[in-house]
């Protein structure tokens, strides 16, 4: 297998494909015409690339019931496979044929910058923000909670925000409300994920309610419905 085959094989493994589905829902809600499939595939490539790199950083050995890419092929190959998926995602956007392609590329670039910064702050959190190494021991001070939200927005929120944003841009619509919805949904997704993974729900309860309200408000603003 070459890097392309390793990357695409992993990209085709499990997952709910929530981000591509959100991209498609935003595109359809905005009355888009044309084939959004390539852009949805790009969103999934970006997501799966982040999982490959996350598994290396976290030392996780299994995903989707199978060995992670680094465990199966080694760290250097896994890094290259993740990088290839990012590059392939950009190629898919450039080949999508939408008039807003330059704006879509710019949105993806800015989103990736924020995502990398959020991931970096999460990894450096213990020393940089005086946070514990994982959010599962999340303390309750306002400063630390605000830092947690900032990391969630950039790590997870950005991925959902970009998905909704690209769908709206491809349809020639105003992407701002869709970005707001995706960002709020992504933070709520991360909060729920952290609680499911064993975080103490008590310090997150109020934050969860806040983002449930934000998600509902922005979803209604977009009239995007259930996707």
Task: Give the location of each predicted region.
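All-alpha prenyltransferase/terpene-synthase fold signal
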Residues: 1-227
């Amino acid at each position: 297998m070459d890097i392309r085959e390793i990357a695409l094989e992993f990209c085709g493994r499990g997952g709910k494909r929530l981000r591509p589905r959100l991209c498609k829902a935003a595109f359809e809600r905005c009355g888009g015409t044309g084939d959004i499939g390539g852009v949805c595939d790009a969103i999934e490539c970006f997501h799966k690339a982040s999982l490959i790199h996350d598994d290396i950083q976290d030392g996780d050995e299994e995903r989707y019931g199978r060995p992670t890419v680094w465990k199966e092929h080694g760290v250097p190959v896994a890094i290259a496979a993740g990088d290839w998926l990012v590059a392939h995602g950009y190629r898919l956007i450039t080949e999508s044929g939408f008039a807003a392609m330059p704006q879509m590329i710019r949105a993806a670039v800015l989103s990736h910058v924020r995502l990398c910064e959020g991931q970096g702050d999460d990894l450096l959190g213990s020393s940089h923000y005086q946070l514990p190494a994982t959010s599962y021991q999340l303390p309750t001070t306002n400063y630390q909670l605000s830092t947690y939200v900032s990391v969630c927005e950039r790590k997870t929120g950005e991925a959902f925000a970009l998905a909704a944003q690209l769908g709206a841009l491809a349809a020639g619509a105003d992407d701002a409300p869709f970005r707001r919805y995706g960002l709020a949904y992504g933070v709520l997704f991360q909060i729920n994920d952290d609680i499911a993974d064993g975080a103490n729900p008590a310090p997150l309860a109020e934050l969860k309610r806040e983002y449930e309200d934000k998600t509902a408000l922005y979803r209604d603003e977009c009239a995007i419905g259930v996707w």
